[in-house]
């Protein structure tokens, strides 16, 4: 992606997802007003980033997809900064959570007031549940301000970095009900 001018693999992924939405909307059997996304881990934060960049996404499910940068692996942003994700986290911001130009609470707020389902396992060793809670708490006032104070649903299963079947089924039901 870098030879094509993208500053990160993440931005290239966002572009690919936006183009996928363009294609979906060109199909006669797709209702472009009822598009939802769902993703786990890398797919979980890709779902958030796509929704932040493209308002055609009406509902979002993110599973094990984010935490505050300070709570991500104890503040060690190495996992975020490798070449396949966002290398500028290392080269520009020195992998320092305090120097990051954004926080995931702001990504959630950018999605508001669209409906958001979060799977945040209690024992996720990558995306710390306390950091997830802090991001959600910071975004909720924006949801309330925009008229959807109950727009974020969070599930806290008793597991590690996983999207357990019962939470996945709850997400599918929620997507179906919310998009109707």
Model-derived features with residue positions:
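Cap/lid segment of the alpha/beta-hydrolase catalytic domain
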Residues: 1-26, 73-74
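Alpha/beta-hydrolase fold nucleophile elbow
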Residues: 29-41
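Loop/turn elements at helix/coil->beta-strand transitions in domains of secreted/extracellular proteins
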Residues: 31-34, 55-59, 112-116, 150
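Alpha/beta-hydrolase-fold catalytic nucleophile elbow
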Residues: 38, 63-64, 119, 157
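Hydrolase active-site cap/lid region
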Residues: 46-89
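The feature captures the conserved acid-bearing segment of alpha/beta-hydrolase catalytic domains
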Residues: 73-128
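Acidic catalytic loop of the alpha/beta-hydrolase fold
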Residues: 123-133, 161-162
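C-terminal catalytic histidine-bearing segment of alpha/beta-hydrolase fold enzymes
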Residues: 136-180
């Amino acid at each position: 992606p870098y030879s094509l001018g993208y500053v990160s693999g993440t931005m290239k992924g966002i572009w690919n997802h936006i183009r996928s939405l363009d294609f979906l909307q060109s199909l006669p059997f797709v209702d472009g007003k009822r598009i939802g996304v769902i993703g786990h881990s890398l797919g979980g934060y890709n779902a958030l980033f796509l929704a932040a960049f493209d308002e055609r996404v009406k509902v979002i499910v993110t599973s094990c997809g984010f935490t505050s940068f300070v709570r991500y692996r104890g503040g060690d942003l190495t996992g975020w900064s490798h070449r396949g994700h966002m290398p500028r986290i290392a080269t520009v911001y020195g992998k320092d959570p305090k120097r990051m130009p954004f926080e995931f609470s702001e990504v959630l707020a950018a999605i508001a007031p669209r409906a958001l389902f979060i799977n945040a396992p209690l024992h996720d060793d990558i995306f710390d549940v306390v950091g997830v809670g802090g991001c959600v708490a910071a975004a909720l006032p924006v949801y309330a301000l925009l008229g959807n104070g109950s727009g974020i649903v969070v599930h806290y299963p008793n597991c590690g970095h996983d999207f357990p079947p019962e939470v996945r089924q709850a997400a599918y039901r929620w997507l179906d009900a919310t998009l109707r």
